[in-house]
Amino acid sequence: MWGDHSTKRQHIDILAVVMIVVAVRKFIFVCCCLLAAGSALAQAPAYTYRDDHDPDGTGKFYAGREIAQVMGHQGADWLERPERQQEERPDILLQSLPLRPGEVAADIGAGTGYLSWRMAQIVGDKGRVYCVDIQPEMLDLLARKMAEHHTTNFQAVLGAVTDTHLPADSVDVVLMVDVYHEFDHPYEMMQSILRALKPGGRVVWVEYRAEDPEVPIKPLHKMSEAQVRKEAALLPLQFVEAIETLPRQHILIFKKK
């Protein structure tokens, strides 16, 4: 009988040790999660607000820059203006993209699809272009543009101000043309873009040159290379190259780490 009691006591002691180990591991796991979350929050720059601000801005500031107002769908004709071909040279832009046949691209702030259908031609039938916009009216115009060019290898996506609503690990190249400076929540939006990018995927910023006073665009709708790189440095992105072949815009390419 004594042996039976001793064996039971040993089993109880072992069970108690196992329970303690499990509890300690859970505690450590929770602490690590909290530390990681705290670290992420610490790294994310805070948004600030000012009542006295540029009339073309939102009064919301990020990384030392005022966020510009979004161009509404009422201004869609400006995206399709005939002179855009010479002012922005989309042909040169598309030749500069790290985009190949069969790949998946995302046109963020696709608008009327001015660039989307051209990108669809590059990736071909085996590729796909996600056309993301937060305005349903823009996506309606985009659908007409795609039909006009008999483009079928695309998917229109209604995004939100904090989320592209793109599938995770689905995109090779993300293109943002004259849109990033209007993101209401740039940090959250870029986190969403990074989730959608495949490992090693590329993000391409195209913005009017703030360094050039001759570029006839309102100041808040321009960005300097230094400002783009400053904000990209807050994210797990590696700078690849700056291409300055466009008449008025930077092409800044980054790679997901």
What function would you assign to each model-found segment?
Residues V30-G38:
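Bacterial N-terminal signal peptides
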Residues A106, A110-D163:
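Class I SAM-dependent methyltransferase SAM/SAH-binding core
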Residues A120-Q121, Y187-R202:
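A short glycine-rich, Lys/Arg-flanked "PGG" loop and its adjoining helix->strand segment in the class I
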